[in-house]
Amino acid sequence: MCCADLTNTCLEVNPDGHCLFAAVADQLAVLGILPRTQATYAVTRTAAANYIYTHPDDFLPFLPSIDGEDGVGATDAGFMTPRQFGIYCTAIRDTAVWGGEPEILALSRAYNIPIHVIQSGTPPVVVHNPAGTPDHDDGLDGTKSVVRISYHRRMYGLGEVGFVVISRIRC
């Protein structure tokens, strides 16, 4: 599946560490969920960080500790401490650290909208549903508003990860 299959077009986003958040912000503005003046990576970074911070039980089991369970001298199960969790949330909010699955899920829930990540791998569309699991109302049938972004690994051959905004083609 590609953008053309979905009658969409791709718009490039600067691969600067904020690309995921910038792509989602753009789509939220296109869908009328955020005013264009507020559709910035800083706003979506803050939304993701705040959601994760206020819902630690939904995220802590999936976030590895700084040292990891296999790190030299590690004696714990590899989970973040409360202090590390706070540092992690602050980094998501205030730095250009890359976002991933936890941040996409947080954005989907914070804005109560499915987020589809289109990629070249399997599965071709990764659905993040605010309810937590894909269901019949996840936007795959085209009847519901959905944020669509495309994931590109090493798009420029430099090893970076980029997200591209997927917008409906306007006729």
Mark where each language-model region is.
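Papain-like cysteine protease catalytic cores
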Residues: 1-127
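Structured partner-binding subdomains within large eukaryotic complex subunits
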Residues: 118-171
